Amino acid sequence: MLSLLTRPFLPIFCFLYGPQSEGSTRIQCLRRFVTFLLGLVLGFLLWKLAALNFTLGRLFVNGATDLYVFIIFVLVTGTIFMLSLPVRAVILLIFVALVGKSGRTYLRAVAFAFIISGPIANLVENAGEVARVFVCTTVLTYNLSKTRFDLMAKPFTNTLKHMRGDVEEIRHTFYELQEVLVDLKYAVENSDIEDEKYGDKNTKPIYERWGRETSRMNVSEIGNGGKELPTPAAVQERFQRNMRNRCKHQLRSGHRACLEVFRNGYRKCTTNFPSMIAKAICWPYRVDIICELDLFGNPDKICDPSAVVPQNFGETYVELLKAEKKLFDNSSQIVVNYEIKDEQFAKSQLKSAERTGQAFKEDFERQKRIFNKVMGILQKILCLFMLRMVYVSINYYVKYLNDVEFDNFYITKYFKHVDQRRKEQRIDAILPLRTYEKSKYIDVDHIFSRTHHESTTVCFNLLQFLLELVTAGLFILIDHLVVELLQIVRKRSKIVYQQDGEHEVRFNISGVGQMARLLRTTMHNFNIHEKVSTSLSNKECLPNAHVLPKKMYYQLILLYLIIIVLIYQSTTFLRMRRVICSFFYYKREKQRILFLYNRILRNRLRSLEFLIHDAEDNLATHRIQQQVNVFLWLRFSCPVAFGWIRHFKFAKRTCMICRGLEDSTFTVCGNCGLPYCDDCAEDLNSVCFQCGVVLTRGAEGSESSVEVYTYRKEK
């Protein structure tokens, strides 16, 4: 198949690298130029491979710098590829390593990077959306509760807001009441003024000022706790004395007024008449003795207040002072304030929903940044697997040149050429290979064939990769479930909060008195009339699920399919490494082929020993197979019912030597039951290696059967 693929390019290769090109300078220059162009192409591919994984564009802020680095890298790669033979081999081996174990590891790292940037990153995005929904719902709930609380608490808040104005009005009302009490206090306690001074024009301002000072004094005294109250008897006696003095003062005031009237009349009369006649006519005005007469009786008897003032006036007045003290105590310095108990707890409870949500969001963003940094570092570490491909390629190149046994099990055209030449010379040849040798060597004409070791490795790698598929599938499934859950929540959780109504509170206080006025002043702030008509929705709080594009899933599936193909056919692709090295070092390849040919010849001289050794290694596997394989157990336990399953691969026995599947030519030992294929039985000279019994195939065994039996006994 390889020759079929390379056949179209064979004329070009012969033209450039044929024997006739060795002496042509023109062809050699053309060969150099073609090699340089191929180096440029490979350099471009290497750059893309490196830039894809290490994101080198991020290292260069300026786009022109990135372009210069790219050009320099490609030119240097093309030049070295043209000049250095080892570099050519290593660069080509790097691209072959992409399809080998290192390449698979690299592609697995890329696939895991897809998982990180796809489902895992999407889980983080959706987690952020859940955080946003939580914050939004918290704010919405807070606002709804706050609206309802404000509506309920508005009378109290209005009262607190207008309390200062109400306090001033109440204080003014208290002052008006105190002004009424000042006159009464003056009449009871401070009316004992001298008779000749009471009522003069000069004393009237003193009286008014005394009233104001008394008012301030009473307020101050009340504010300071007040003075000691008088006894009822003292009040009774003082008020009666004041009433008596006031009565006498009124009588004296009448006497003075009478004298003033006579005096003024006489003056006017003498003014209007001549002096000779005035005395005769105006003499009646000189008779002011009338003013001296006690027309109403004895003043002490008339001004006696005992019959007028009640006997319990003192007690009533003292009770009035007590009531005033209780009513106006600290009324002049009213201060409305409140105190929060357990202030720290109150502050924590009064924290708004916006601050809580912002703190939650900041904490989530901080954790998200840490997660992204960790995932970024992990992704860069995975990208370092590309360096492993370079290391593996160089290692293969070194071992190919230094270790003649390394990767040397191919039956090539030159191998067949040597074997045919030996046949023509009638010397022992190798081809065709024996049955037990076919599983150890690969014929390059059958490019898809594998050795037994390669088949085992492929199965193990497929099982290992299956675990990675399960892990990736779990991440994808979890992401899909989260997205579906968020979409269901968005579809079925939309709520519209509609509030329509009227909230009215009215306090009606009847009465015209001072207390009714005070109550109306205090309680009018509790009156409220609010019409509520609000419509709120949680639409903004519904989650917006972040869905991965289908393109990502297609790319991931395609990548996994490529990895599976590479695992299954990795051995086929890796054989290109030998082809590349043999192309550049064909003499070394001839040495390796001749070494392989001679090694097979040497092994055939000891073939019997190798056959028995392989059979002993396979014996344990055969016994386990007999116990574990249910189909084999059914086939041999119930041959009548399940004999038909012998036609299927899973119910067939394998040869003890070459592990080939059972066919019609198989020979089974009659003593121990070990199976052998026809070729391996012939190589063993028809003698069972386990028990030494001759294998019956319709013909007698050769003389070498005794040799096999003796070898078994010695072992």
UniProtKB/Swiss-Prot annotation:
Q: Which Pfam families match?
A: DC_STAMP
Give residue ranges of zinc fingers (RING-type): 655-691
A GO BP entry is: sperm DNA decondensation
| Expression sites by tissue | Specifically expressed in testis.
Q: What is the name listed in the Swiss-Prot or TrEMBL entry for this protein?
A: Protein sneaky
The species is Drosophila melanogaster
Q: Where in the cell is it found?
A: Cytoplasmic vesicle, Secretory vesicle, Acrosome membrane; Cytoplasm; Cytoplasmic vesicle membrane
Q: How does it sit in the membrane?
A: Multi-pass membrane protein
In its UniProt record, a GO molecular function of this protein is: zinc ion binding
What domain of life? Answer: Eukaryota
TM spans (from-to): 33-53, 67-87, 110-130, 374-394, 458-478, 554-574
Classification via InterPro entries: CSR-E3_Ligase_Protein (IPR051856), DC_STAMP-like (IPR012858)
Tell me the name of the encoding gene: snky
GO cellular-component terms in the record?
acrosomal membrane; acrosomal vesicle
